[in-house]
């Protein structure tokens, strides 16, 4: 159970960082 909660926390942290960077700077990432 602890591993599942740990993975959820890591995923949420990565999502927060991603959205923070994405909304802080104009999107210049081109695929």
Swiss-Prot record:
Organism domain of life: Bacteria
Pfam family, one: PsbT
Stated family: Belongs to the PsbT family.
Protein's job: Found at the monomer-monomer interface of the photosystem II (PS II) dimer, plays a role in assembly and dimerization of PSII. PSII is a light-driven water plastoquinone oxidoreductase, using light energy to abstract electrons from H(2)O, generating a proton gradient subsequently used for ATP formation.
Transmembrane segment boundaries: 3-23
Signal peptide: none
Record's subunit section: PSII is composed of 1 copy each of membrane proteins PsbA, PsbB, PsbC, PsbD, PsbE, PsbF, PsbH, PsbI, PsbJ, PsbK, PsbL, PsbM, PsbT, PsbX, PsbY, PsbZ, Psb30/Ycf12, peripheral proteins PsbO, CyanoQ (PsbQ), PsbU, PsbV and a large number of cofactors. It forms dimeric complexes.
Matching NCBIfam families: PRK11875.1
UniProt-recorded name of the protein: Photosystem II reaction center protein T
Gene Ontology CC: photosystem II reaction center; plasma membrane-derived thylakoid membrane
InterPro entries the UniProt entry points to: PSII_PsbT, PSII_PsbT_sf
Lineage: Bacteria, Bacillati, Cyanobacteriota, Cyanophyceae, Oscillatoriophycideae
GO biological process, one term: photosynthesis
Cited HAMAP family: PSII_PsbT
Membrane topology: Single-pass membrane protein
Main localization category: membrane
Subcellular compartments: Cellular thylakoid membrane
UniProt keyword terms in alphabetical order: Membrane, Photosynthesis, Photosystem II, Thylakoid, Transmembrane, Transmembrane helix
């Amino acid at each position: 159970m602890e591993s599942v909660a740990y993975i959820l926390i890591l995923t949420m942290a990565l999502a927060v960082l991603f959205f923070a960077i994405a909304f802080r700077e104009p999107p210049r990432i081109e695929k």
